[in-house]
């Protein structure tokens, strides 16, 4: 992953260094407020909108070490689409809490927050409803399986309904292992999930999920 870490105080830089040590297999760049002049850190420019915008469009994850409000203000002008926005995480300077702010599922912010929190001995603050209710998260599942979501509006409706009741799923391909919590096999109902490539709408509101297939021709 390409990860950028931003710190705004001496203690924040100490925590940022700890975070960087936890990510040896990732490409991590660190930046600090200009007044700090920390070794190994780039400088956050005073006119920072374009600076954060470039990282937002390029990075897989942005980690802010400081007040949560800083992260929100800096990313706000650049938020576009949950399918493409990077994971954004905030960590307080004492590393007590690790908070995914943006792209918790598709961008992987929740998983990264759990990973960092476990290594730092911090508390992960997860607020996505499917996670705190231990329910199936269709967008997270699709990313992990390498699938594409056909319609994000339908995905939101599935996520909302699954908090209330189980959702039927039907697939043109075998589903390995046990079904996630909140899913049942079925081919009828008001709302459900279809996995495959056919133009099928087995449910009144069908969320189509497309597996990726690589075709080679000689």
For the regions a protein language model found, what residue spans apply to each?
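Conserved mixed alpha/beta catalytic, RNA-binding, or beta-rich assembly cores of soluble enzyme
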Residues: 8-37, 41-47, 54-57, 61, ...
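Extreme N-terminal starter segment of soluble prokaryotic enzymes
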Residues: 1-5
